[in-house]
């Protein structure tokens, strides 16, 4: 069984907001390839994996997105905006981004026989 976590190419700040500072921060040498659900599925299938399950996960809350949009730098989850990150809002935001396929992270579980 393989469990892999990768940055999501459809991250809300990349695909919808198109925040150049965030894009430059995200596309660095450790992240040579960002995947979508489709590209990660094809990659794993080509490598011989089966029973592939890919789920979007949102690791950073709304405060982080606001901080990026306003201040153009990371750390929003620890910024002056962090007070808005109630459990209910965080869950709703995560679910909304998952429904839009715009989470920041993809988690894949696959098996090889």
Predicted regions span which residues?
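Short secondary-structure boundary/capping segments
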Residues: 18-21, 69-70
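Conserved SAM-binding loop
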Residues: 1-19, 29-49, 105-113
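Extended hydrophobic-aromatic, low-complexity segments
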Residues: 12-15, 52-54, 63-64
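Glycine-rich FAD cofactor-binding loop and adjacent beta-loop-alpha segment at the N-terminus
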Residues: 24-28
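A C-terminal cap/extension of S-adenosyl-L-methionine-dependent methyltransferases
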Residues: 56-113
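A SAM-dependent methyltransferase catalytic signature shared across enzymes that methylate proteins
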Residues: 37-57, 82-87
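Short, flexible, glycine/charge-rich loop motifs used to bind or transfer phosphoryl groups or to couple energy/partner
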Residues: 21-23, 97-98
């Amino acid at each position: 069984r393989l469990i892999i976590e990768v940055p999501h190419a459809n991250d809300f700040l990349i695909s919808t907001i198109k925040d150049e500072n965030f894009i430059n921060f995200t596309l660095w040498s450790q992240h040579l390839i960002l995947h979508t659900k489709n590209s990660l599925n094809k990659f794993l299938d080509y490598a011989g994996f089966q029973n592939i399950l890919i789920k979007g996960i949102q690791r950073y809350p709304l405060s982080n997105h606001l901080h990026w949009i306003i201040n153009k730098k990371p750390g929003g989850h620890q910024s002056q905006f962090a007070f808005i990150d109630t459990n209910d809002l965080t869950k709703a935001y995560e679910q909304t981004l998952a429904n839009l396929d715009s989470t920041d992270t993809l988690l894949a579980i696959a098996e090889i026989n």
